[in-house]
Amino acid sequence: MNWQKEAINDLRQYYARKQSLENMAERKLALEEKFKAIKCAMSDSTPVMGGASRIEDNMLNNIVERQKIDLNTEATSRLVKITERGLSGLSDQQRLVLEKFYMDARMNHVEYLMDALGYEKTRIYEIKDRALYSFTISMFGIIDY
């Protein structure tokens, strides 16, 4: 496994994962409201010949979807916390370089970093490589075997 690629992937997905935590919470609230509406309609239907009603199917689907959201939220939250811990072990300069290269990559990010940090292009890439190595070690432990 290429641990450095995994670390880069974690950095690139950090902001999207963090945003998804808010979105999943909102989605769960919407499903809970929908579940209340389904329960209200439950008294109106009677299954035919012992089969399940469409409303019961909708209730079960709603429950399963909420459970999936809970599990996804837990997993995503852990990944966000792990990434934040990995970033917290870096210097401000290293964090800024990784952010501009991977997390918030925009046009001319190298030039921006050259101006912001006062270094030449080769030095920016050296800082990026060292920061990425340190981040990868903090995320995955020993990677050089």
Regions found by a protein language model. Give the residues of each.
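N-terminal positioning helix adjacent to the helix-turn-helix/winged-helix DNA-binding module
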Residues: L79, L90-Q94, I127
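Secondary-structure boundary/capping signal
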Residues: Q94, K121, I143-D144
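N-terminal interaction/assembly modules
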Residues: M1-G89, G141-Y145
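DNA-recognition helix of helix-turn-helix
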Residues: L117-S138
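Helix-turn-helix DNA-binding module
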Residues: A105-R123
